[in-house]
Every structure is written in C-alpha cells, then in structure tokens.
C-alpha cells in the first residue's frame, strides 16, 4: 500500500505521485507519515519536506502552509515550493547573504523581519538542493 502525495502551491503542482513515506517540516517539528497514518491537519513551516518514492528520497523546499493526512493521502498546500534538483543554489546563497547583511546592518523592524524570513527560505532552498544532489535511501 502506498501514500498518494500532492504538494500544491497557488500557481502549480510541484509533486503528485504515489510515495512510500513523507517527512514534513511541521511547525511543531519533523513529522513522519507512513501508510495507515491517523487523520491529521498540521501547519507547515519553512523547511524541507522529504518524499520517498520508488525507494529513493526526494527533497522539496516548502514555505509555510498546511498539510492534511487522510485515507493514505497527504495533501501539502504551501505558499511556495521547489524540488531540490531544480533549486538555483547560487541564487539561494545570494539571498542568504543579502538577508544576513540586512540583519547585521538594519535597525528597521520590518526590514529585519523580512530578512529573517528570507534567511529561512534561503536555508531551506540550499538544504533541499544539497539533499537533491544525493542519491540512495
């Protein structure tokens, strides 16, 4: 038996396929989902979700949203998502560097808040890219 996993953003579907296992970056911590999991609704933070399909792990950077688990279906609705192998690592590193610079120099609360969010996003993208470049289980 498998899980049907969907990762959906406002403008596209990032993943829609049968999978064996999912690890979600819930706001309360990492959450593992296998077949037969109890129904669940949880908030998703900025981080990397991992999907095991055909015996291999896939990393997807996700940016805030919700996940629902019911009847061996996992639906992840997030603001943004990017598969690890499609991440532009140089652009993500540039975003991280710029956000760190703003945090070190700005005293404006709004700028600092946005920089913290950008840092989280960049770190998730970089982590997904690094995981996406690895093979195996």
UniProtKB/Swiss-Prot annotation:
InterPro entries: ATP_synth_F1_dsu/esu (IPR001469), ATP_synth_F1_dsu/esu_N (IPR020546), ATPsynth_dsu/esu_N (IPR036771). GO terms for molecular function: ATP binding; proton-transporting ATP synthase activity, rotational mechanism. It is found in: Cellular thylakoid membrane. It comes from the Bacteria. One of its GO terms (cellular component) is proton-transporting ATP synthase complex. Gene3D superfamilies: F0F1 ATP synthase delta/epsilon subunit, N-terminal (2.60.15.10). Disulfide bonds: none annotated. Keywords: ATP synthesis, CF(1), Hydrogen ion transport, Ion transport, Membrane, Thylakoid, Transport. It is a peripheral membrane protein. F-type ATPases have 2 components, CF(1) - the catalytic core - and CF(0) - the membrane proton channel. CF(1) has five subunits: alpha(3), beta(3), gamma(1), delta(1), epsilon(1). CF(0) has three main subunits: a, b and c. Belongs to the ATPase epsilon chain family. NCBIfam families: ATP_synt_epsi, PRK13442.1. Produces ATP from ADP in the presence of a proton gradient across the membrane. This is ATP synthase epsilon chain. The lineage of its organism: Bacteria, Bacillati, Cyanobacteriota, Cyanophyceae, Synechococcales.
């Amino acid at each position: 038996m498998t899980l049907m996993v969907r990762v959906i953003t406002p403008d596209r579907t990032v993943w829609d396929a049968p999978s064996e296992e999912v690890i979600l970056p819930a706001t309360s911590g990492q959450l593992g989902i296998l077949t037969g999991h109890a129904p669940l609704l949880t908030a998703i933070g900025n981080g990397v979700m991992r999907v095991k399909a055909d015996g291999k792990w896939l990393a997807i950077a996700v940016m805030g949203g919700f996940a629902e688990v019911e009847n061996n279906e996992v639906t992840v609705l997030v603001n943004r998502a990017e598969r690890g192998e499609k991440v532009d690592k140089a652009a993500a590193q540039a975003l991280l560097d710029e956000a760190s610079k703003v945090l070190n120099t700005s005293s404006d609360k709004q700028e600092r808040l946005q920089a913290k969010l950008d840092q989280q996003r960049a770190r998730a993208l970089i982590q997904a890219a690094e995981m996406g470049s690895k093979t195996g289980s």
